[in-house]
């Protein structure tokens, strides 16, 4: 203790002991706090000696601060202690902890800019898990639970969509291989995806080992070893080795390398989930441009290409693959157009409507010019017209081709078009007032955001006003102007000055004009009649009258007449910036826009019954009074259907709006909260309160610019009157953005209260609030009232009927007591007959109960739901399901409670096996006091064992613990250390093993048999194999032993995989207690090496039984068809009569030819009758053919006469390549110069050898030259220019260039000159590599295509000729000739004809005549007199 107490001494210790723990509190810091902090630092793996210096405290603060958000109360206390000590070391006086934290925050804010600049200079990310400690050593900082939780949520929500890759890249910034494996382990449940990822990692690791061979000899002292592929993957390297490699000089970035491998694998997985190619994305003739863009970018994200290539694809393919209408517009915009400009320009383009508009525009221009010719002799020079839309002269707005300008062309306001504008024509002050209105509108919206009151009020701009109010919470956020506020609890009557006379007048925002009682005003007036509620009255109209309202001056029209009350109308109120403010939360609105290029919903309202219309009118009238909705006019073109339903067991109606269409057009919102809070994560508190926010969504304002899209209409019966139109001012129920915006807004509102009361725990989920504290009940309730007042100031009410003050508290489906919690009471129904829906609800209730009731099982009940059943189908309960339900009823009879979390104690998770693949677990801190319980019964693969299932349970519990408590528990597992260790050493995800201990809770988990790692000396060796015929389903399985024994059995209705397993079962049956088995089946090896103890396959279960009986078993794999002794013998044995076996006969010749030509495996399999696996093995064993992948071809125009030409460069020389698009056939030559003359000569040679109709080239100077154009003209060749990767472009030749260079690389050493190697490569490509359509080589394919083309043309001629004939025919024994029918085909014995249907008529009953263009009439023998063909 002495060493730890030496952190402070002398005067500093005195200063320390004068600092208060809390502002105004009695308790102060003591020496014991330093001792406690030293011990805590050791728990967090930090050096306690750091507390002795300023720099050391700064280091601790940097380490602890990022974890405060998810950390425990102990962590926060430690941080507060170190922060206070930091200022004592600097001899800076602080009174209490809060002041120390405030000063620390100020200092960090001052240095933030400097720190950011330092980061930019270094160019190094500060998010690395490897950090430098005080001693200068590089240490590892594990990934935070928050990061792992975010990664898990991404996979759960996005599956393996393209967004997963950038998210993984961001979350794993600077991670070590161990960190990356931890991330993979947390999503290890996706086995198919993980297997693909594993295969990719293994391939890349093998490639790394091949490219980085091990250095011979021992490693010199002081030098670290080079990492192998498995080291980079984190399976054979320690964390310290990884850190050493990553921080050495020069560094070996094993983390980044491994991350690159994982991203390669993720790309493959994404490809599997998103198999569409970017080349396939084309805009349909009538498809809206915005939908096409959505599809394009969705597929683009999945493309495996660099960002530069993706940018290029966006610039070119997006335009090229648009439909002709949109493409014309996009090309007119130019190459620099943004996506938003494209969307705007193409809005509404496409389909018959667009074509009609274009035609109308053309017709109107023709008509106008004709009219001008007729009127040319009358008036003088024609007035120049100007477009409202683009501002240019010479055309009208309706004929304008520019993108339509937003808003009305008359008044400039948005939300309606000029034809719907309600502005009156005779508005002499329109331009002046419009500018003032715009200013007032802008001004008032800013003020509304900052200082909107909590009751309905009228605001008027003013300089001085004693009525101005500002709340404490909002002080400092308002505008620099002072706005008077006039509440509407009484009539808003103010004193105004008109023409120097004072009058009391009502501020009426619903009146258009200002009307006063008899008052003498100077100036001229004119009579006018105005309509009011009581009828029409005669008034005098005075123009340009000056009026002063609340210190503001306005000039406008005043009407004087017998009005019952003086009214100041909108013509004056708008000039002084008067606004009407509703009781909506004054928080800043979240800006929302529609998806780019989309417009709002325009869905018609469907008919409603009379009672529903009355209910909706009543509901909406009340909502309008409360300011939640506003009436709108016909200028709003949008609409969403509305309807009403009755509450369950009630006569009250509920209004529902069908926002599905608006939701489609609204961008996605990121859910602020990733899940619901769990009571097991709550800390025990002395006082607790549960609140509910009333009308939660309706208390948060909706973005003003977005409100128009929420419009809806209440119809009338029999269309008696126009529908009543409304739009929402607040967040609507059913709109996709409401939950996220509400959560975000509520978090901002609660932030000041949280800051002010850090010792109070406040859980917020939607409109449910849980508040806990360690205060006495009186103080606690005072704080609750303070919270309620705080919420009320922001417009949120907390109804008394949902204000829970006394336990038990009902919260989020749970029942909370002061020192325990449970789920709310669960009653299981007792039914004679169960429907599918009943069982689904029952399983849901049991799953909910399982989080606190241990031992709940649902496996047998879930089995009842297998298959596709209707919800109302009756399902009989099986005996097992009835037993399971009865056991669950017994469990639920006894009430069970969970306790609350204590951060000072460790978490312990205990797992038990229940049998039949079901598991249960409890998480606790003290024995018999569970925090929560759970169950697991998911079987992820057909063949599994208990150890594998146990690891899945451990994974689930660990993930659950990270989410609820932010840390993993210590596990107590029913398995021996040796069994667990044996399994994990073989299991591929052995990178993260949780802390655990053995607990002897029967039944224990064990491995029922163990496979040997080395052959058993002295044991008999069985070579096993199986074969099956795919067509007949007949098969054989057997074995051959090293002692001369052999056995073969015949099997029916089987497959190759089953026969391989049957052969292993046969060997196990006929062998002794020790046996060596050799198979060539990876399938069978994979199943048995996983050591399953149960399987869905009966055959695998039989093999497991045999394995358990054996003392020792060794299982090995050898490749098939390689001439390996016993394997070859047994293969011939089981293949007899089943399949044709060709072994070594052609292998030598194939290998010899491959060394010369490096032909692909398809060509060798075809030419030498080799099995594909053997041919692939020959290619795999060739060191020059280890280039990954083959050229991928997009969809291009594959007409027989189309060729693509391009120049490529190699060894400083130019190779001119021509590719026949349909076949892939290549012609190539090394040319002396990239000139038009050489290119034209090459084209003429090509045309002399093959039929060339069209050539596609790029825009190179040699291809665009006059010489090439002349050659093409002479040879009657059409020349087209394209863009790479685009249909009818250069994609094929670009990929063939790569393929050609690859082949040249393989044969280059066989030729002295490059031109020789080029021709060798052309020969190999055209005749020695097979594949693609028909399995031909390119040379065979081009000949086949040309021959087929000739035959097709000839056949077409015959068809055309045949179609000139008509057929008269007789049916069965009827003597009457029928017809004429159309001749489709003429054979030797019959003809095929088409009349009302297609028929086959014998040749002897048909008369074929030539169609001379006139109808043959009558049923006589006219047909017989015609010439028969």
From Swiss-Prot:
Domain of life, source organism: Viruses
Residues reported in the UniProt entry to bind Mg(2+) 1: 692, 767-768
Segments for region (Interaction with membrane phosphatidylinositol 4,5-bisphosphate): 73-77
Domain Integrase catalytic: 1196-1346
The protein's required cofactors: Mg(2+)
Domain Reverse transcriptase: 626-816
Species of origin: Human immunodeficiency virus type 1 group M subtype K (isolate 97ZR-EQTB11)
GO terms assigned for molecular function: aspartic-type endopeptidase activity; DNA binding; DNA-directed DNA polymerase activity; exoribonuclease H activity; lipid binding; RNA stem-loop binding; RNA-directed DNA polymerase activity; RNA-DNA hybrid ribonuclease activity
Chain residue ranges for the region called Dimerization/Multimerization of capsid protein p24: 273-359
Comp. bias regions, Polar residues: 110-124, 445-455, 467-479
Region of interest (Interaction with host CALM1), residue spans: 8-43
Lipidated residue numbers (N-myristoyl glycine): 2
Annotated stretches, region: Interaction with Gp41: 7-31
SUPFAM superfamilies found in the cross-reference section: Acid proteases (SSF50630), DNA-binding domain of retroviral integrase (SSF50122), DNA/RNA polymerases (SSF56672), N-terminal Zn binding domain of HIV integrase (SSF46919), Retroviral matrix proteins (SSF47836), Retrovirus capsid dimerization domain-like (SSF47353), Retrovirus capsid protein, N-terminal core domain (SSF47943), Retrovirus zinc finger-like domains (SSF57756)
Region spans: Dimerization of protease: 484-488, 532-538, 571-583
Short motif (Nuclear export signal): ranges: 16-22
Protein name (database record): Gag-Pol polyprotein
Residues under site feature: Cis/trans isomerization of proline peptide bond: 217-218
Gene this protein is translated from: gag-pol
Manner of cofactor binding, per the entry note: Binds 2 magnesium ions for reverse transcriptase polymerase activity.
């Amino acid at each position: 203790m002495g060493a730890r107490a030496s952190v402070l001494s002398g005067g500093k210790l005195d200063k320390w002991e004068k600092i208060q723990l809390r502002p105004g509190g009695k308790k102060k810091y003591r020496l014991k706090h330093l001792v406690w902090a030293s011990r805590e630092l050791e728990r967090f793996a930090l050096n306690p000696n750091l507390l002795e210096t300023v720099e050391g405290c700064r280091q601790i603060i940097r380490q602890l601060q990022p974890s405060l958000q998810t950390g425990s109360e102990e962590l926060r206390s430690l941080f507060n202690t170190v922060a206070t000590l930091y200022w004592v070391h600097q001899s800076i006086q602080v009174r209490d902890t809060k002041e120390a934290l405030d000063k620390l925050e100020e200092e960090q804010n001052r240095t933030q800019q400097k720190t950011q600049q330092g980061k930019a200079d270094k160019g190094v990310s500060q998010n690395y898990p490897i950090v430098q400690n005080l001693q200068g050593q590089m240490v590892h900082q594990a990934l935070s639970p928050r990061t792992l939780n975010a990664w898990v949520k991404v996979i759960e929500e996005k599956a393996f969509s393209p967004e997963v890759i950038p998210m993984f890249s961001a979350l794993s910034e600077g991670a070590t291989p161990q960190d990356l494996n931890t991330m993979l382990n947390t999503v290890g449940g996706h086995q198919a995806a993980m297997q693909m990822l594993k295969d990719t990692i293994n391939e890349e690791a093998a490639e790394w080992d091949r490219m980085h061979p091990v250095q011979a000899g021992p490693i010199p002292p002081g030098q670290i070893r080079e990492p192998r592929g498995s080291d980079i993957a984190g399976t054979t390297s320690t964390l310290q080795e990884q850190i050493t490699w990553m921080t050495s000089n020069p560094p070996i970035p094993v983390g980044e390398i491994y991350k690159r491998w994982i991203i390669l694998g993720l790309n493959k997985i994404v490809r599997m989930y998103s198999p569409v190619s970017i080349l396939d994305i084309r805009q349909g003739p009538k498809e809206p441009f915005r939908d096409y863009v959505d599809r394009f970018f969705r597929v683009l994200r999945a493309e495996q290409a660099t960002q530069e290539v993706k940018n290029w694809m966006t610039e070119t393919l997006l335009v090229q693959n648009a439909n002709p209408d949109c493409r014309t517009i996009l090309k007119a915009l130019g190459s620099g157009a943004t996506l938003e400009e494209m969307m705007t320009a193409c809005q509404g383009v496409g389909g018959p409507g667009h074509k009609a508009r274009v035609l109308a525009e053309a017709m109107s221009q023709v008509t106008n010019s004709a009219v001008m010719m007729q009127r040319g002799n009358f008036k003088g020079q024609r007035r120049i017209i100007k477009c409202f839309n683009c501002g240019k002269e010479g055309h009208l707005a309706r004929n304008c081709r520019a993108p339509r300008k937003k808003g009305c062309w008359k008044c400039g306001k948005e939300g309606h078009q000029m034809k719907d504008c309600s502005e009156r024509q005779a508005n002499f002050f329109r331009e002046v007032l419009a500018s003032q209105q715009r200013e007032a509108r802008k001004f008032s919206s800013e003020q509304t955001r900052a200082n909107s009151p909590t009751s309905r009020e009228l605001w008027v701009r003013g300089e001085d006003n004693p009525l101005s109010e500002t709340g404490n919470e909002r002080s400092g956020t308002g505008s620099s102007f002072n706005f008077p506020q006039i509440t509407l609890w009484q009539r808003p009557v103010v004193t105004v000055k008109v023409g120097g006379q004072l009058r009391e007048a009502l501020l009426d925002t619903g009146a258009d004009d200002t009307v006063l009682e008899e008052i003498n005003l100077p100036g001229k007036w004119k009579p006018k009649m105005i309509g009011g509620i009581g009828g029409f009255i005669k008034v005098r109209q005075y123009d340009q009258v000056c009026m002063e309202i609340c210190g503001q001056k306005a000039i406008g029209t005043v009407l004087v007449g017998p009005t019952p009350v003086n009214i100041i109308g909108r013509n004056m109120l708008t000039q002084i910036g008067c606004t009407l403010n509703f009781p909506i939360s004054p928080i800043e609105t979240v800006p929302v826009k529609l998806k780019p290029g989309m417009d709002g919903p325009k869905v018609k309202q469907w008919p409603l019954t009379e009672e529903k219309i009355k209910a909706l009118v009543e509901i909406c009238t009340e909502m309008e009074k409360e300011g939640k909705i506003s009436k709108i006019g016909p200028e709003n073109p949008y609409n969403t259907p509305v309807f009403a339903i009755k509450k369950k067991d009630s006569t009250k109606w509920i209004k529902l709006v069908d926002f599905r269409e608006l939701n489609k057009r609204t961008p996605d919102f990121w859910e602020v909260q990733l899940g619901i809070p769990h009571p097991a994560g709550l800390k025990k508190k002395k006082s607790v309160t549960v609140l509910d926010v009333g009308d939660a969504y309706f208390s948060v304002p909706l973005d003003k610019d977005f409100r128009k899209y929420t419009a809806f209409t209440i119809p009338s019966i029999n269309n008696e009157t126009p529908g009543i139109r409304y739009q929402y001012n607040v967040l609507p129920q059913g709109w996709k953005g409401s939950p996220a915006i509400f959560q975000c807004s509520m978090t901002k509102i609660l932030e000041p209260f949280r800051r002010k009361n850090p010792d109070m725990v406040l859980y917020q989920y939607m409109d449910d609030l849980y508040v806990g504290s360690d205060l006495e009940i009186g103080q606690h309730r005072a704080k609750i009232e303070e919270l309620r007042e705080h919420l009320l100031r922001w417009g949120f009410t907390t109804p008394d009927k949902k204000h829970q003050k006394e336990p038990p508290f009902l919260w989020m489906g749970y029942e909370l007591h002061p020192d325990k919690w449970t789920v709310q009471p669960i009653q299981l129904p007792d039914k004679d007959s169960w429907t599918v829906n009943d069982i689904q609800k029952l399983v849901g209730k049991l799953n909910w109960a399982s989080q606190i009731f241990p031992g709940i099982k649902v496996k047998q009940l879930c089995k009842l739901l297998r298959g596709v059943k209707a919800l109302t189908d009756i399902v009989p309960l099986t005996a097992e399901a009835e037993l399971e339900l009865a056991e669950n009823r017994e469990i639920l009879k006894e009430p069970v409670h969970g306790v609350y979390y204590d951060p000072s104690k460790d978490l312990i998770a205990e797992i038990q096996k229940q049998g039949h693949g079901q598991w249960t677990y409890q998480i606790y801190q003290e024995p018999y006091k569970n925090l929560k319980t759970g169950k697991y019964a998911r079987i992820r693969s057909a063949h599994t064992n208990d150890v594998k299932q146990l690891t899945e349970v451990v994974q689930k519990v660990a993930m659950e613990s990270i989410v609820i408590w932010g840390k993993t528990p210590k596990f107590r597992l029913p398995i021996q250390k040796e069994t667990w260790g044996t399994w994990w050493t073989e299991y591929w995800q052995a990178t993260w093993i949780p802390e655990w201990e053995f607990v002897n809770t029967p039944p224990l988990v064990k491995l029922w048999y163990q496979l040997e790692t080395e052959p058993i000396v002295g044991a008999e060796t069985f070579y096993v194999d199986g074969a099956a015929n795919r067509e007949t389903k007949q098969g054989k399985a057997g074995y051959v032993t090293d002692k001369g024994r052999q056995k073969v059995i015949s099997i029916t209705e089987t497959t190759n995989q089953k026969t391989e397993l049957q052969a292993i079962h046969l060997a196990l049956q006929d062998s002794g207690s020790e046996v060596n088995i050799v198979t060539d089946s990876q399938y069978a090896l994979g199943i048995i090496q996983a050591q399953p103890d149960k399987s869905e396959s009966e055959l695998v279960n039989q093999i497991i039984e045999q394995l358990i009986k054996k003392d020792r078993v060794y299982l090995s794999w050898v490749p098939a068809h390689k001439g390996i002794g016993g394997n070859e013998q047994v293969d011939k044995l089981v293949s007899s009569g089943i399949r044709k076996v060709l072994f070594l006969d052609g292998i030598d010749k194939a290998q010899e030819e491959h060394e010369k030509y490096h032909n692909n495996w398809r060509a060798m399999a075809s030419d030498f009758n080799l099995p594909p696996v053997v041919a692939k093995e020959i290619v795999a064993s060739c060191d020059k053919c280890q280039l990954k992948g083959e050229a991928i071809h997009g969809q291009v125009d594959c007409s027989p006469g189309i060729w693509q030409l391009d120049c490529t460069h190699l060894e400083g020389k130019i190779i001119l390549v021509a590719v026949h698009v349909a076949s892939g056939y290549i012609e190539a030559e090394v040319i002396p110069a990239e000139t038009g003359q050489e290119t034209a000569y090459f084209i003429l040679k090509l045309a002399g050898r093959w039929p060339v109709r069209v050539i596609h080239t790029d825009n190179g100077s040699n291809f665009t030259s006059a010489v090439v154009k002349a050659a093409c003209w002479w040879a009657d060749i059409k020349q087209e220019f394209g863009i790479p990767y685009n249909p009818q472009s250069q994609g094929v030749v670009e990929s063939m260039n790569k393929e050609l260079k690859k082949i040249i690389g393989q044969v280059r050493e066989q030729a002295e000159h490059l031109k020789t190697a080029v021709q060798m490569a052309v020969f190999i490509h055209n005749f020695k590599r097979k594949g693609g359509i028909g399995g031909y080589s390119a040379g065979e394919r081009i000949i086949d295509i040309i021959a087929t083309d000739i035959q097709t043309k000839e056949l077409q001629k015959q068809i055309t000729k045949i179609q000139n004939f008509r057929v008269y025919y007789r049916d069965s024994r009827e003597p009457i000739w029928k017809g004429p029918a159309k001749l489709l085909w003429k054979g030797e014995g019959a003809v095929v004809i088409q009349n009302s249907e297609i028929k086959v008529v014998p040749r002897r009953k048909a008369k074929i005549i030539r169609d001379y263009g006139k109808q043959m009439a009558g049923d006589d023998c006219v047909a017989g007199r015609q010439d028969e063909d």
